[in-house]
Amino acid sequence: AYYNTVNKNNEKTQIFLNAYLQAEVIKGLKYKLNLGLRKDHTKSRTYTGTYDLGTYGKNDAPDLSEGSSDYESWVLENTLNYDKEFGKHNLAAMVGYSAQKDKSYGLNGSNADIPEFIETMTGNVKSMTASSSLNELALVSLFGRIMYSYDDRYLVSASIRRDGSSRFKKGHQFGSFPSVSIGWNISREKFFKPLENVFDQFKLRFSYGKLGNQQMDKYYPTISVVSDGMNYLQGNNIWFGQLPNVTAVSPADLTWESTETFNAGLDLSLLNGKLTLTADAYVKNTNDVLLPIPYAASTGISGLSIQNAGQVRNKGFELSVNWRSTIGDDFSYYIGANATTEKNEVTKITAGGNNMAISGYSAHGAGGRGINRFEEGHPMSYFNLIETDGIFRTQEEIDNYKNKDGKQIQPGAQPGDVRYKDWNGDGVIDENDQHDVGNPFPDFTFGLRLGGEWKGFDFGLFFDGMTGNKIYNYQRYCLESGKFNGNYSTKLANSWRPDNQNTDIPRFSKTDGADNGLAYTDRWLENGSYFRLKTLDIGYSLPKNLLKKIKLENVRIYTSMENLFTLSKYSGYSPDLGESGSVDIGASYSVFSRGIDQGRYPIPRTISFGIQVSL
């Protein structure tokens, strides 16, 4: 009913321009200029009519909000590339410079209680509001790379880039990010000849690289913001004031987040290319992690301050195996599989002291407590929740639920209420019982490819999945906790009652002594493992002898299907959440968004048909 009173209109115009110029300066030396331009214009308008929806809300007079925004950006890149072969030696080098600038401007206005049937910004001027915004961002880079190989046997490459960002203050704007790699193609060595009938390639790889990250919501995180409206009444006079630093400001020494990666790899090809294998082991150390951190409540400052919060280590192993062969003269096929396992851990906290734990996403109704945390010795963004242990079936169970000192743990509970685990053993269920109950990162991710071709027919399948990850189902919390006015899940019809005790849903009551609808418990945490048929392609290519008559090279008729099925215990729309900027923690930081399902748009199932023609 509410949405029937709302009329929303959005218009967006985008213009893109990409161009390049390339010239050979001297033999082997090429200059290239790349230019990219983009311009966006957006208009939005929302008109909300009158409504009376009882406890949900009431609007006695229409409201109107209008806005427009403009965004423009340009990217300029200059590069010089040099390639030279002399005998068994091959040398390639590149140097370049790039610059980028983004600028956005927004204007918004709104008015409440406007006259009905007059959809313009008129009416009560006291309720009118207007605001504007202007943001600019600049990034400059110098970079270079050199690669050398001898007889395709020994390979060496090195690169470095120097990036500068306007997000940081002077003295901290620039970061240097080098990398180096070496490779040894052992199968090219003379001593490997006895095995050359088995191995087509046997190569070892080692590399080190450093990458920088300056992505954050705020354009000017270290600059103080002056807030007006700091007014007070003294006698018959109103004093109008402004105050700096009312919102959170980052430290002046805020700088680049950097990730150092150490990698060792192996590439194998056997049996005339039928079997290939690639394996990589790696360690990634991320330093000066950019995270949003709240000020102490005593400061009176709201919002989150972006800080270089700590260090994170990722250790993992990746394996990819592929087999390609034929059966008879007409049927060819391939099978491929890949798998990754990784361990994630916060190794150091550098913001607020080594013992500090940084709270992340706070669900509505969580009382400001974080659902996930960034804490030393744990995976980043692990779920910090109170464990549940089923439902009390009888009063006797409640009376006997005591700690080691004989203290009754949930004295206010009734049969049908949730049993919470007293993790610290003090006989009280509170924030001290929150602890690590899982994290959003999978223990194991995998993929499987199958395909083949027979007399013009071809097919291909791709499966993917992951295991071991957890998802906080915020949608289910909203629909089943009883904390909200509005629609409830039909599952609540199966709530515990004296005549319906074989259920895992607690009794339904707006007031209860156990607080069955707590947000910061693992009642809303689910297994995010899944197995999915991601793509299925089927095609048929017309015979060549037929195509010659109509002077065509190739004609293929096909159907392509995506997301045909997903096997998962997760009750939401899709367990494949990835990362999102939609999680409301005051800033869009993917580290705290992963594994939080706030109503992510479900992945669509698509089936398409087509024809490919080559002349």
For the regions a language model picked out, list residue spans one by one.
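Extracellular/periplasmic, surface-exposed regions of secreted and cell-surface proteins
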Residues: 1-48, 58-375, 520-615
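Residues embedded in well-ordered regular secondary structure
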Residues: 2-8, 21-24, 398-419, 492, ...
